[in-house]
């Protein structure tokens, strides 16, 4: 297996060698997800792909870590392919791959997630994006791929009926990763967040994050004893400003959003200095 060195932590234009690359593949839907294996199918012919993913469904856990319980890794097989199944979260999977299993990837790919990861909301809650951010924080360029699901109930259904959509998505994964390997990872970017519409009618669009993906709501129900319990639920946002990831997906374009780990609000520093009389 060909190993690559991690890039400098400073965002820069990362170039790749001409050797067969090593790609670490993970996700948050679990090691048995059809989306994960669609990504594998897109990559394995021209890259050494190491699969290390959660053993179970871990959607919406963001970049959380398992620090109060031990982590176990088992090997699982899919045909003649061996993968690592981690009894933890997506971020745990990345950390164990890098620091326990000795994987030295040239690039980390997270996905294909079943369901879009758009807007401020998804970036901070998505386990798919969280895994990519974790890899980037350790110096590895990372790409998160997600497929739009118009009916959110499909998120947790048997995904085999999405085979036709995964076929198109595999082409996107293959093209995006080949472009990166041939031309280099973009400067000042830690993670590329790629969202694929359920039906592609346009091309690539470079976007920025919308504010919302969902209209947040809470559904109250009663258990058999009359005690209330709640589901956090709500419909998808139907539109967003031009140039945002949500708007691009609604147009049928493939949204590519550059993400950085630096969450500092630089534009707010002057107001903070005035607030604390530091001018």
Curated annotation (Swiss-Prot):
GO terms for cellular component: cytoplasm. It catalyses: a ribonucleoside 5'-phosphate + H2O = a ribonucleoside + phosphate. The keyword Heme does not apply. It is an enzyme of class 3 (hydrolase). InterPro entries: SurE, SurE-like_Pase/nucleotidase, SurE-like_sf. GO terms for molecular function: 5'-nucleotidase activity; metal ion binding; nucleotide binding. The keyword DNA repair does not apply. Its cofactor is a divalent metal cation. Binds 1 divalent metal cation per subunit. Gene3D superfamilies: Survival protein SurE-like phosphatase/nucleotidase. Its EC number is 3.1.3.5. It is found in: Cytoplasm. A divalent metal cation binds at residues 28-29, 59, 113. Belongs to the SurE nucleotidase family. HAMAP family: SurE. This is 5'-nucleotidase SurE. The gene is surE.
